[in-house]
Design a protein with these regions (language model features):
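Generic marker of residues within folded, mature protein domains
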Residues: 9, 209-211, 344-346
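Sec-dependent N-terminal signal peptides
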Residues: 5-14
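Long, Lys/Arg- and hydrophobic-enriched amphipathic alpha-helices
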Residues: 307-357
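Active-site histidine-anchored catalytic micro-motif
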Residues: 22-299, 303, 307, 312, ...
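N-terminal secretory signal peptides that target proteins for export/translocation
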Residues: 1-2
Length: 357
């Protein structure tokens, strides 16, 4: 949903930022990762306060569960379209340190693939204050660099998916710290390798800090679900079933089939591979089969969670599912916000929110 705005922004900043080593970054004064999208997402405290009031007025019930999420899958689209799905899910992320696993929408333009992508910023901008980068970032990266991970501030700088989550994480915890990672194109086998390696790195770091999963650290992955229709998708026809009422209903049925078969219940390698079979072309993993933008981030996050779980499987619950044309559009124009794309029966996006524990 961000293609028009973010693509133009990407072209402007591409020449201004380059990959830098962790050592060089430490020698310089801390750099703040600036914002990509100030239209679809809130970036000021009063915007967030107003939005949360409006979400509650739509019937959202606050989640005070005693058992926090260890891993979640959250959308990253315009707040007016997603409504309360963000706080419904993220309020129950209680950890002080959050490993963010996001989409790398612009990776192909930079010819980046096959590696987890870290960054070297000193902090990220948040509505109330800058969001600190956890010291765990350097520790995790040190264990992964070369074979499984690389640095690219250029790619991280133009990516919007993780940015969408920060205002809500900071709303519920003003002192939250983050480790931002984005996932470009990679084969299903490579996703498994990277997820397993990330789990091993996390296990070492968690042991060093004496952290408890869910209490001290959590994994927050992001994807929007299907990007559907044949209108204003850059010339692409993504309406597999057509975009009349019958076609859209068939698309929703497939969405729930994917969620039920792959994402709900215990995390297993078989379910993760099945998710890839739904979303990736069998002959070329670079090509969409069903247009979930997190077709790489979700498997990596689930493999990481699977291999990190030492006692039993994590089990996933569907907290909510909606789309940009079925959910009430929360008013945002008076908040100096808006929308980055249209929402019509021939151009809509699905939103799946799942929590694991």
């Amino acid at each position: 949903m961000k293609y028009k705005i973010v693509t133009a922004f990407f072209l402007v900043v591409l020449g201004l930022y380059s990959c830098k080593s962790v050592n060089k970054n430490q020698a310089a004064s801390p750099r703040i990762r600036p914002l990509v999208d100030t239209v679809g997402f809130a970036h000021l405290p009063w915007q967030m306060d107003a939005l949360m009031t409006r979400f509650r007025e739509t019937g959202w019930k606050e989640n005070h569960a005693a058992n926090p999420w260890k891993t979640v899958i959250c959308p990253h689209d315009d707040y007016t379209y997603t409504g309360a799905i963000y706080p419904e899910l993220l309020e129950n992320v209680k950890a002080a340190t959050v490993l963010l696993i996001g989409v790398a929408h612009k990776a192909a333009q930079l010819k980046i693939e096959d590696s987890l992508v870290f960054e070297t910023y000193g902090a990220w901008k948040g509505p109330w204050k800058n969001v600190r980068i956890s010291a765990a970032r350097e520790e995790i990266y040190r264990l992964l660099k070369g074979k499984y991970a690389m640095l690219s501030d250029t790619l991280q700088r133009v990516e919007h998916s993780l940015e969408a989550l920060i205002p809500f994480l900071q709303y519920f915890n003003r002192n939250v710290e983050i480790v931002p990672v984005i996932v470009p194109a990679m084969s299903p086998e490579r996703m498994k390798e990277c997820g397993k390696a990330l789990a091993e790195a996390l296990r070492n770091v968690v042991a060093d800090h004496n952290w408890t999963w869910g209490k001290d650290f959590a994994i927050v992955a992001t994807t929007d679900a299907v990007h559907y229709g044949n209108e204003d998708w850059g010339g692409s026809d993504r309406a597999r079933f057509g975009c009349d009422s019958e076609g859209n209903e068939k698309a929703l049925m497939l969405e729930h089939e994917i969620i039920d078969n792959c994402l709900k219940g215990d995390i297993t390698p078989e379910k993760i591979r099945l998710f890839s079979s739904y979303t990736l072309d069998k002959d070329d993993y670079h090509v969409y089969k069903w247009t979930w933008c997190g077709r790489y981030s979700v498997p990596v996050a689930l493999y990481t969670s699977y291999f990190l779980a030492t006692q039993g499987h994590l089990s996933g619950e569907l907290v909510d599912y909606s789309t940009s044309i079925t959910r009430f559009h929360v008013p945002v124009d008076d908040l100096r916000m808006g929308r980055t794309a249209i929402a019509t029966p021939c151009h809509w996006v699905g939103y799946a929110a799942l929590g694991y524990r």
